[in-house]
Amino acid sequence: MSDKTNDDKTLSVNPKKTLTLKRPGVEQSTVRQNFSHGRTKAVVVETKKRKFSRPDEKPEVEAAAAPKPAAPAAAPQQAPASAPVSASAAQASAPQPAPVKAPATKAPAAPSAPVTKPHVAQQRPVHQRPGGQQAQRPRPADRSGMVLNTLSRSEMDARRRALEEAQIREVEERARAVEEAKRRAEEDARRAKEREESARRQAEEEARLKAEAEARRKAEEEAAKRMPQPEARSERRDDARPAPYGARPQQAGRPQGGRPQPAGRPQQGSPRPAPIIADAAPIAGKPLPQSQLRKPGQSDDDDDRRSGAARRGVAAKPEVRAPKVVKGEDDRRRGKLTLTSNLEEEGRSRSLSAMRRRQEKFKRSQMQETREKISREVTIPETITLQELAQRMAERSVDIIKYLMKQGQMMKPGDVIDADTAQLIAEEFGHTVKRVAESDVEEGIFDVADNESAMVSRPPVVTIMGHVDHGKTSLLDAIRHANVVSGEAGGITQHIGAYQVVQNGQKITFIDTPGHAAFTAMRARGAQATDIAILVVAADDSVMPQTIESINHAKAAGVPIIVAINKIDKPAADPQKVRTALLQHEVFVESMGGEVLDVEVSAKNKINLDKLLDAVLLQAEMLDLKADPDRTAEGVVIEAQLDRGRGSVATVLIQKGTLHPGDILVAGSEWGRVRALVNDRGEHVKEAGPAMPVEILGLQGTPQAGDRFAVVANEAKAREIAEYRQRLARDKAVARQSGARGSLEQMMNQLQVSGTKEFPLVIKGDVQGSIEAITNALDKLGTDEVRARIVHSGAGGITESDVSLAEASNAAIIGFNVRANKQARDSAEQQGIEIRYYNIIYDLIDDVKAAMSGLLSPERRETFLGNAEILEVFNITKVGKVAGCRVTEGKVERGAGVRLIRDNVVIHEGKLKTLKRFKDEVAEVPSGQECGMAFENYDDIRAGDVIEAFRVEHVSRTL
């Protein structure tokens, strides 16, 4: 070996080894480790020597590299194979430059790790593979003299199974350990979270208590500092006002560069005391005023004492000079604006009134004065918001919310509460409660007691009722001497007419009602608004269904009946038959020992009309009808319609009081001011007394026929009542459309109806009564499968909005005695909406019935054709299986429906694909003949099966 410099890297060539690049100062050696079953492994050990030096010494540069270690392959050649050589490691750690050969004695066979110093071990370079390039791995010596016992196959299998079971157990134990660790970690995390939450709550509570105590202490200090001392404060402000250009005084004893907080310095937010100006030299050539050169009240003796102390050598605190930075007039306003500096400025002082208010507030807080509680009577409706309740109680809504929070309820000012909760809150705040219902707005409007001393006789109200075409309107026309029938379509009365006639100087009010079945509700309203009912029965037609219905309505209303046997001039007239038929319905006329008046009349020839009127007046005299004309008007709406030129027009019958133009009235859910009163002859009148029918102009909307009306004091009351009734009607409509969830029966009905088909319609009519009759008639047409749905109905002409609604809901438009304007017609033609016009209700119902019948699914009707028995099954290419059959009953037609029956069980139903006889396609095969049949999309046929042929027909249904 030769010494080399540190930069010299030598290459050692060995024919048995690969080329290696040695690092200077590093010695390498190889040791061998023994393992079980005679296995060994060679390990390369590197040892680097490091020279330690004191911190004050400079490290010496090594002049020569470390001595070259012995060849790592020499040791294994001299030592036995069973003993690892550790001498090279010892040589590497020895300080001698020359290597020493290991003795040839046998070393103990203990596989030990390389002997290295842990604190001087050198890390491998990143690019160097461990032990791969420094030295060649020596070949293990031949293991001579060692005998391995071979295991049998059963032992090896047993060991393998034991090893596999051990591995499985190890995996399971590891999984259990992981689960246990995970569970323990989750438990620890949960407990730690609970501890943190508890500590956080405790810290928040302590912080809150500390903040409250601190705030209380600050408030007390603030109150003590702000005690009203006007004179002292003004003197202090005058004496302690800082000079604009004076230097800031320094406190004695303050070290240079530091800024400790003085002991008596007030906290932030409290008023800062005025600064005391010490002696300071003039700055920037400006002499300071005398008041700023020394403190107020300071004498020259103080200066002499201070200078004398300095001369006597007394240790005095060093005087700290003010900073040299001087702000100009503009620079003074660039600093940070704080509350303290803001309050100290002279221009921002409080006004005298603000000072007085502050003093009064402070006195009240000191004396703990409480305002006198004012108890109020709070009116509480069924539902009320918190904000409105607070306004009625003259309380703050915040106080109500705080009270509810104490009760465990989190609410906002806009939340709605019920009357019980509102009552509890109001009583808790010391108020008295007056509970009112929402319907109380209607109290005092209807059924007001009459003044008995002011009661006068009034005309009777007579309703003419009877079957269709029995002469009701003709009789009234004969009485009124006016041709009313010619104005009705088809001679049928479509809506109620109210008229007044005079007989022997006395007035009689007549109400004409429709007779056909669709106008049941209108007859019922007419009976309720009447005093006497005239039952018109044709002498040649006797009692009919609507006659019976009219009798029932009159009995239900409790009004007396006068029977008018009409058409006695006809040859087939039989008045006695009519009287006998009325006995079956408990109507006993006077001629047959009863109390019901009966008169035989002829409206066409005007026979016995005066006797009929005398009977009406006699019955009215027996009833002793009276009313108070001086009270507010009250009555019932007979009919309402929307007139193009006059707006909403309502025909009303006044039952009590007198109605004047200008009165404010409420009719159903509509209200308005009476603009005009028109009688039955089209004349404007200035007043309408009891039992007088008139038309009212001026309502905001069209009321429903049968609604009661009453005069109210002002518009606010009328608007409140109308809004309440509109809200009720809206809620009912929503509940009806959405099928509000009620009982189980209602829910089941809703489920059944949900599968029905609907026929949407938009209906516009001339008067409300006709629309109501059409709606009721269409409702009766509905079945479980189809029904008419009225999207919109109203009185008046057809407008563009009706067309838009019909287009959105895919509905048809029906006009009854009304027409569409030009814009509506153009819009309907453009959008493809059908508009149909009718003037007779029967035609309308028939057309709608026919249209609804088209929505019904057709009826499936099946006709049996015959049976055939399969004798043999043939498999034909491109056709499939073909059944060779014999027709045993009836016949089989091509294209007919078939059922495949096997053991009296239908296993397939389909259609015939082919029907052949002797390779010819035939239309049908009669009984007793053989044929070939194939099914569509079905091949599972066997000999012995029976084929049943049938024909299916779809028959359209009608309502």
Swiss-Prot record:
Binding-site residues, GTP: 466-473, 512-516, 566-569
Function: One of the essential components for the initiation of protein synthesis. Protects formylmethionyl-tRNA from spontaneous hydrolysis and promotes its binding to the 30S ribosomal subunits. Also involved in the hydrolysis of GTP during the formation of the 70S ribosomal complex.
Chain intervals for the UniProt region annotation (Disordered): 1-374
Membrane spanning residue stretches: none
Annotated keywords: Cytoplasm, GTP-binding, Initiation factor, Nucleotide-binding, Protein biosynthesis
Sequence ranges of Low complexity compositional bias: 63-118, 128-138, 246-284
Protein's UniProt keywords contain Nucleotide-binding: yes
CDD domains on file: IF2_eIF5B, IF2_mtIF2_II, mtIF2_IVc, UDM1_RNF168
Compartment(s): Cytoplasm
Residue span of region G3: 512-515
Entry superkingdom: Bacteria
PROSITE patterns the record matches: G_TR_2, IF2
Region ranges (G4): 566-569
Ranges of Basic and acidic residues composition bias in the record: 1-10, 154-225, 232-241, 318-333
SUPFAM superfamilies recorded: Initiation factor IF2/eIF5b, domain 3 (SSF52156), P-loop containing nucleoside triphosphate hydrolases (SSF52540), Translation proteins (SSF50447)
Protein name, per record: Translation initiation factor IF-2
Biased composition (Polar residues): 27-37
Annotated stretches, region: G5: 602-604
Positions of region (G1): 466-473
Species of provenance: Brucella abortus (strain 2308)
